[in-house]
Design a protein with these regions (language model features):
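Acidic/polar, glycine-rich intrinsically disordered N-terminal extensions of enzymes
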Residues: 1-122, 128, 269-278, 580, ...
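Active-site cavity-forming subdomains of large catalytic enzyme subunits
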Residues: 3-5, 14-15, 33, 123-344, ...
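Catalytic or ion-coupling anion/metal-binding cores of large enzyme and transporter domains
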Residues: 4-36, 54, 246, 250-266, ...
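Core structural elements
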Residues: 42-47, 99-113, 208, 352-358, ...
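Conserved phosphate/anionic-ligand binding catalytic regions in large, soluble enzymes, centered on
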Residues: 112-122, 127, 133-157, 205-207, ...
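Extended active-site and interfacial segments that coordinate phosphate-rich ligands
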Residues: 138-147, 162, 173-186, 219-233, ...
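Internal maturation/activation junctions in enzymes
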Residues: 141, 347-370, 374, 378, ...
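Catalytic alpha/beta core of large soluble enzyme barrels
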Residues: 310-312, 355-360, 430, 443-446, ...
Length: 776
């Protein structure tokens, strides 16, 4: 086992005693020790909005107790494949329901949503192969649409596709190249999204040796392309050595394996980090490290991951994930809070059993996925609540003690997971591909029911249900202010911080509102030890984010979902250092997020940022996406009824305006068309809607008219009124959501489901208000 450094001293022990005393008798204490803990209000809201069964009119048909029963009973039906006794099934029902109802473990969202329902699609994500032929490519596009229609996400490697301009032997033409075909998959996602289901997420990966790698790296630079894709470059340790040596490396044509030129490794790496700084893409994955841990190399090479990057998969494999709530894996002794290793062990066993049953009960969207998933029986036991656990133990997140604890916990979880899978193998048999797997090699024979059973996945929505911190991330914020319709403020505080603040006598409404505004305790009048224990994501340097990811990676079979947070004024060099540290510390990939880099800065700030963080005055009109949504507003003018259509980008920002008068033709219509074109150009160039309204409002002509008590002075004034009403309506809706933009620097990027504010955590967009997560 990893040895935890003995850095504790009397002061730290006193902190632990204070925290324990503050938590005793609170709802936190009750939740940890209850067989049926009370759910937080936000947990109930998220469950009702996204998980509980409803009829066609949207009426809720079950409560959360019913949901846990539904899932447990459905998954327990798999017991009949191995033991058809009613007693065995009932024991499984009781075990599964108990571990979920105690909020000690939750499977991924599709299992909670769909188990026991008609869809019965229990996996979130899949990887599809993309072969180098037109028929195969568009067959995968069709499969992608089927998966997205069922609510799943998809990962692809486009590394097998011949480069742009290469000769196509069958036709004598030239190849379009990977980036062009990625656009076809992106368009298919848009079409399914328009069909009414939630947007499917995609991961696109290209190996660094592909001749089109530079075009791939810059493919999302303008912010208007591949908006349904995360992209990552697959690199190797050999490539990183050439980066260090400032050396060239070979490009290989995947069609025939021929030499296709050279690039300078350092220049390519610098371009990757610059684009990641600017847009958040591309990430990187260390493909050789991933394949070093491939449990089934006899079945092929791992080429891609799921959309969030933490689950490498063979072609046609699926995600089957769940997370243990570490915040519950504790007990209160006489003086302090301690880890309850026995409870952790039992929870791991129940988790492995439940996830193995998911494989048997899953209704996979494509037969090839069903076959491969049952052949490898891959599962992914992960964690959530690590930051809450650190608070209970009085440990600072960015400390060597926290890093050592992470390794210690993950090593125990990995070993317990292997043991539980081995015990299932004795009863049910090994997974079908076991004979030639890495688990049955000379000197390393271990019966396993499941392949690579440990993964740290995003816990976006299920962590809200469990009422705990996300995955291995630090606390994101300690206090939120929720604005109610009558303009009153409701403070929502982190329960651990609130308990300590009240116990120590420094709690006040004013403190919580100030904390919600600042987002950090850094300059606030609270005890120093409180500032140390209650660290938030933006208090922690990127270096410590990477070191924590690396600590968990050491005992994780697959990969680790983690966001490396940067302040908005971080430089390209800062991102480069993080990418390099991820390589040096053994990570299998890295996702970075610089505040504001994904908030549509071309649209919101009126300019782009330089490497030093200084805003440029140069404006460029964003390219129009293929699909936009909008609303049409009626304004009565002296020239007739005017219909103003305002279309928005996917973040809810006004993007273009079309105007039409009831009586077509003539100079009035021409003037309106000219105004609409110029307003659209201004919006696409980053000029704010408020600024446009200010310029157009009040312009008068000789035909004013009244519209619902408001004087409309002219055609341009009518456009200003419509645009103002749209913007005011959007803001009014946001008033019911979490006011986090001032804390997290996302530029107010709205949730696509409730218009609340999205945060970037675990490599995914996540809404604290309704529970939306791009990765669920």
């Amino acid at each position: 086992m990893t040895i935890i450094r003995k850095e504790t001293n009397e002061a730290q022990e006193e902190v632990r005693r204070i925290i324990k005393a503050a938590l005793v008798g609170t709802l936190i204490d009750e939740r940890i020790n209850s067989e049926a803990p009370e759910l937080y209000d936000n947990s109930k809201v998220v469950l009702e909005r996204r998980y509980l069964g409803k009829d066609r009119e949207g009426n809720v048909l079950e409560d959360f107790e019913d949901m846990f029963t539904r899932v447990a009973e459905n998954l327990a039906e798999a017991e009949s494949k191995y033991d058809d006794s009613a007693e065995t099934k009932q024991r499984a029902v009781a075990k599964f329901r108990a571990v979920m109802r105690k909020l000690d473990f939750l499977p991924n969202s599709p299992t909670l949503m769909n188990a026991g329902r008609d869809l019965q699609q229990l996996s979130a994500c899949f990887v599809l192969p993309v072969e180098d032929s037109l028929d195969a490519i568009f067959d995968r596009v069709r499969h992608t649409a089927i998966i997205h229609k069922s609510g799943g996400g998809t990962g692809f490697s486009f590394s097998r596709l011949r480069p742009e301009g290469d000769t196509v032997g069958s036709t004598g033409g030239v190849a379009s190249g990977p980036v062009s075909f990625i656009n076809a998959f992106d368009a298919a996602t848009d079409v399914v999204k328009q069909g009414g289901t939630r947007r499917g997420a995609n991961m696109g990966i290209l190996e660094v040796t592909h001749p089109d790698v530079m075009k791939f790296i810059t493919s999302k630079e303008d912010g208007t392309h591949l908006n349904n894709f995360n992209i990552s470059v697959a690199i190797t340790e050999e490539f990183m050595e050439k980066v260090s040596a400032n050396a060239d490396y070979d490009l290989i044509n995947p069609h025939d394996g021929s030499f296709a030129g050279t690039l300078n490794a350092k220049e390519v790496f610098d371009t990757m980090t610059e684009l990641a700084w600017k847009t958040g893409d591309p990430g990187i994955v260390f493909l050789d490290r991933i394949n070093r841990d491939n449990p089934n190399p006899q079945l092929g090479k791992i080429e891609s991951t799921n959309p969030c990057g933490e689950q490498p998969l063979l072609p046609y494999e699926s995600c089957n994930l769940g997370s243990i709530n570490l915040a519950h894996m504790v007990h209160f002794n006489d003086d302090v809070v301690e880890i309850d290793w026995g409870r952790l062990s039992e929870t791991v066993k129940s988790s492995v059993h439940l996830l193995d049953n998911v494989i048997d009960m899953n209704n996979y969207p494509i037969e090839a996925i069903a076959e491969m998933s049952r052949t490898t029986r891959r599962i992914g036991v992960g964690i959530m609540g690590f930051a809450d656990l650190l608070v209970q133990l009085g440990i600072k997140y960015d400390s060597y003690e926290a890093v050592d604890l992470a390794e210690n916990i993950m090593e125990r979880i990995q070993e317990e997971t292997y043991t539980a899978s081995g015990e299932l193998a004795e009863i049910r048999g090994t997974f079908p591909a076991w004979e030639e797997s890495i688990y049955n090699q000379e000197g390393n024979r271990r019966k396993m029911r499941n392949s690579a059973p440990v993964t740290i996945a995003p816990t976006g929505t299920i962590s809200i249900i469990a009422g705990t911190s996300s995955g291995i991330e630090p606390l994101f914020a300690l206090s939120y202010v929720r604005n109610i319709m009558d303009n009153t403020k409701l403070v929502e505080a982190n329960p651990y911080f609130e308990a300590v603040a009240k116990s120590e006598g420094f709690y006040s409404q004013e403190l919580m509102e100030e904390l919600a505004e600042k987002g950090t305790l850094h300059d606030m009048d609270v005890p120093e030890w409180v500032k140390e224990v209650f660290r938030t994501a933006h208090d922690i340097s990127p270096e410590w984010h990477v070191r924590m990811q690396a600590a968990f990676q050491r005992f994780t079979d697959n990969s680790v979902s983690k966001t490396i947070n940067f302040p908005s004024d971080a430089t390209v060099a800062d991102v480069k250092e993080a990418y390099t540290l991820a390589y040096e510390t053994g990570c299998k990939g890295i996702t970075v997020y610089r505040d504001g880099s994904k908030s549509g800065q071309t649209l919101n700030t009126g300019g782009s940022l330089t490497e030093t963080g200084v805003e440029s005055n140069e404006r460029t009109a964003a390219e129009r996406p293929r699909v936009l949504n909008g609303t049409t507003h009626l304004v009565r003018t002296g020239h007739g009824n005017m219909y103003v259509t305002i279309n928005c980008d996917e973040d809810g920002n006004p993007f273009e305006v079309f105007g039409a008068l009831g009586k077509a033709g003539g100079s009035d219509s021409a003037q309106l068309e000219a105004i609409s074109r110029l307003v659209s150009l201004a919006l696409r160039s980053g000029i704010g809607a408020d600024e446009i309204v200010e310029q157009l409002k009040g312009i008068s002509d000789d035909s004013p008219a009244w519209d619902e008590g408001e004087l409309v002075k002219s055609t341009p004034d009518a456009v200003a009124i419509a645009l103002r009403n749209y913007v005011d309506g959007a803001r009014e809706e946001e008033n019911e959501s979490w006011s986090l933009a001032n804390i997290i620097g996302l530029g107010g990027k709205p949730c696509p489901e409730c218009d609340g504010t999205l945060i970037m955590e675990e490599g995914c967009d996540k809404c604290m208000s309704c529970g939306y997560s791009k990765c669920d």
